[in-house]
Amino acid sequence: MKFSKFYAPTTKEAPKDASLPSHQFLIRGGFVEQIGSGLYNYLPLGKIMHDKISRVVKEEMNEAGALEVSFSVVTSGELWKQSGRYNVFGKELLRFKDRKDNDFVISPTNEEAAVALVRGKVTSYKQLPLNLYQINTKFRDEARPRFGLLRGREFTMKDGYSFHSSKEDLKREFDLMEATYSKIFTRLGLNFRAVEADSGAIGGSGSKEFMVLASNGEDDILCCEACRYAANVEAARRKPRVSEAEAPEADAAKFLTPNAKTIKDVAEFFKVSEFYCIKAVMKKAIYEDKEEVVVFFVRGDDELQETKAQNACKALELVDASEADVAKAGLVAGFCGPVGLKDVKFFIDNELRGANNMICGANEKDYHFVGVSVSGFNEERFKDLVKVKEGDKCPVCGGNLKLSKGIEVGHIFQLGDKYSAAMNATYLDENGKVKPFLMGCYGIGISRLIAVMIEASHDEKGCIWKKECAPFDVEIIISNLKDEAGVKFAFELYESLKKAGVSVIIDDRNERFGVKMNDFELIGFPYALLVGKEFANGKVEFITRDGLSKETIEANDAFRKIKESL
């Protein structure tokens, strides 16, 4: 490609709202152009990157036996009503009506469309398993689109959906997709971890996120320093804690505790560790058809993890309960406990199951119970509710958990029959019985990956592309177009590299040398071959973008040097 014929409008200034390097360099480097809030046009450089990433994803998905399809970007609202997600998904789902007043959505994901595609067509266990995927445009009406391609409203995603006749086969495919995703991100040169995750609006169980470790990451992840365990903080587990502090001595006795409303007050009043106090966190759970106060009980020195709490009560949203909400529910703020609590939905953290010698509110103003045993409750009350923190112990090996920042680039789920059962998508098993499909779904953010690669590899001058995914492998820079011999050499090398299968761009623009070098550093091709003043002495300069190291070599050795570097 000749730069003189290429379209990459570079700029010196970054957009005012571009806080992240990826956002700044994608705009300044002429990869994309913002046309609205969370909306971007792809220029030639951006489209090349998009297609290179897509090709890697396709190759590995095809190798794993998945089949490529293409769903309509617009999906019938009726399908989303059948699955139950039409109202649950919230305002991020862009809904509209056509001229005949039919409901439609612009798909942020395609579980419903995938189920509809096989429903009534795949009818026997003999046709299973089946794994279908696409790379297509999605739309999510984000309230605050930001960070460029990392959180836009319109984006490109690889989404796949598998169908199975047994849990064992679903788990096999889930593990295969985990291995396939690992191959994809390894080929793209990314430092990533597969982490346990919350399933969110997609639903199901057994999900994993693929996180690229980056200081600018928007997600908090906990990684074990001794083994491969890693998890998003929303789903992180830990080895149950123990305390060497002395436990309170009493046998479920009731004590007057005037004005001791906080955990700190109670611990100081009884002169015990907060570890032995039970904290009540009151929330208002919002459902599709009602609202109610829900109480979550955790140890006094723990914090409630909001996503875990929301999953426990299966609410659409959790908000803090107001004083009026608490009073209406018949609760006594500051003195609420699980013992004798009636007519209110409540959950207890798993680590409190069977705990002895605990202190909790007596559900009466100014009174607490001391010496409580957390037993005799229905098992459905116990849930994983606590926020795991750095320094807690790994649930797998007991090593220390370390907090890191990450950017999500992929997510895989074991959905079970959530969608197939709701949408009446069934098959006949080997015994002739009608059963709903078991499903998995698997997503990769294609457009997001472009930004993530920059976040993971850049300096103050611009992008530093890995050769596995660079828009061009090497750039030949002609510093002086009046040097006929140098120009002739540069174009002969350019043609030789093209014939050898090297992706090469030659900067033959009638621009100052400084402009050409600045653009090379900003755009970030892995290597550059500079044909400059030293060419008169048979020398050229080989530049490595990562570190901007320069090496003067014989001009006749340039082809070999480039090929070896690639």
Curated annotation (Swiss-Prot):
- Matches recorded under CDD domains: ProRS-INS, ProRS_anticodon_short, ProRS_core_prok
Q: Which InterPro entries match?
A: aa-tRNA-synt_IIb, aa-tRNA-synth_II, aa-tRNA-synth_II/BPL/LPL, Anticodon-bd, Anticodon-bd_dom_sf, Pro-tRNA-ligase_IIa, Pro-tRNA-synth_IIa_bac-type, Pro-tRNA-Synthase_IIa_type1
* Molecular function, one GO term: aminoacyl-tRNA deacylase activity
User: EC?
Assistant: 6.1.1.15
Does the record's keyword annotation contain Ligase?
yes
Please provide, in alphabetical order, the Gene Ontology terms of the cellular component aspect for this entry: cytosol
Catalysed transformations (reactions)? tRNA(Pro) + L-proline + ATP = L-prolyl-tRNA(Pro) + AMP + diphosphate
Question: Which Pfam families does this UniProt record tie to the protein?
Answer: HGTP_anticodon, tRNA-synt_2b, tRNA_edit
| Key words, A-Z | Aminoacyl-tRNA synthetase, ATP-binding, Cytoplasm, Ligase, Nucleotide-binding, Protein biosynthesis
Presence of keyword Protein biosynthesis: yes
Which is a GO BP term held by this UniProt record? prolyl-tRNA aminoacylation
- Give the location in the cell: Cytoplasm
Q: Could you tell me which SUPFAM superfamilies the record lists for this protein?
A: Class II aaRS ABD-related, Class II aaRS and biotin synthetases, YbaK/ProRS associated domain
Q: Which NCBIfam families match?
A: PRK09194.1 (NF006625), proS_fam_II (TIGR00409)
Please describe what this protein does.
Answer: Catalyzes the attachment of proline to tRNA(Pro) in a two-step reaction: proline is first activated by ATP to form Pro-AMP and then transferred to the acceptor end of tRNA(Pro). As ProRS can inadvertently accommodate and process non-cognate amino acids such as alanine and cysteine, to avoid such errors it has two additional distinct editing activities against alanine. One activity is designated as 'pretransfer' editing and involves the tRNA(Pro)-independent hydrolysis of activated Ala-AMP.
Q: Which family does it belong to?
A: Belongs to the class-II aminoacyl-tRNA synthetase family. ProS type 1 subfamily.
Give the quaternary structure. Answer: Homodimer.
Instruction: Fill in the domain comment.
Output: Consists of three domains: the N-terminal catalytic domain, the editing domain and the C-terminal anticodon-binding domain.
Protein name, UniProt field = Proline--tRNA ligase
The organism of origin for this protein: Campylobacter concisus (strain 13826)
Q: What is the lineage of its organism?
A: Bacteria, Pseudomonadati, Campylobacterota, Epsilonproteobacteria, Campylobacterales
